[in-house]
Swiss-Prot record:
Protein name: Large ribosomal subunit protein uL13
GO cellular component terms, semicolon-separated: cytosolic large ribosomal subunit
Disulfide bonds: none
Domain of life per record: Bacteria
Organism of provenance: Rickettsia typhi (strain ATCC VR-144 / Wilmington)
Length: 155
């Protein structure tokens, strides 16, 4: 028996909507990364984009455990301006209370996806919205109840 390898024409993508209200960030991000890659499907093929399209709503209500929210020793995001001494840092709490709270989820998932062209294509299938409204109702997404999968998922 030969190993099955899917062809691009055989790949069927589903649309999922996940409510991130009171969900732990790392647990959600790891599950979303698996679904974006398509590793939850028996027809997974490593060199093809066989993952699903995922819509995450209520991103501003995501939860972090421990001291990660506002503590400087907790979750800190670094960036560099490109100038000498230009390293900047911010905490997850500042990002969540800022203008674009969905960036926390996008960064967490992006850092769990492979860093190549295929990973960029898979990240384009992720749609994160800060509130409960999204413009993808025409795709008829299926609700994925992440909170009920494990009691540790919800905080």
């Amino acid at each position: 028996m030969k190993t099955y390898s899917a062809k691009p024409s055989e790949i069927e993508k589903k649309w999922w909507v996940i409510d991130a209200k009171n969900i732990v960030l790392g647990r959600l991000a790891s599950r979303v990364a698996i679904m974006l890659r398509g590793k939850h499907k028996p027809s997974f093929t490593p060199h093809l984009d066989c993952g699903d399209n995922i819509i995450i709503i209520n991103a501003e209500h995501i939860k972090l455990t421990g001291k990660k929210l506002n503590h400087k020793d907790g979750k800190v995001y670094y960036r560099h301006t490109g100038f000498p001494g230009g390293i900047k840092d911010t905490t997850a709490g500042k990002i969540l209370s800022g203008k674009y709270p969905e960036r926390v989820i996008k960064m967490a998932v992006k850092r769990m996806i492979t860093r190549n062209v295929l990973g960029a294509k898979q990240m384009s299938n992720l749609y994160v919205y800060a509130n409960c409204e999204h413009p993808h109702m025409a795709q008829q997404p299926t609700v994925y109840d992440f909170a009920s999968k494990n009691p540790k998922n919800k905080k």
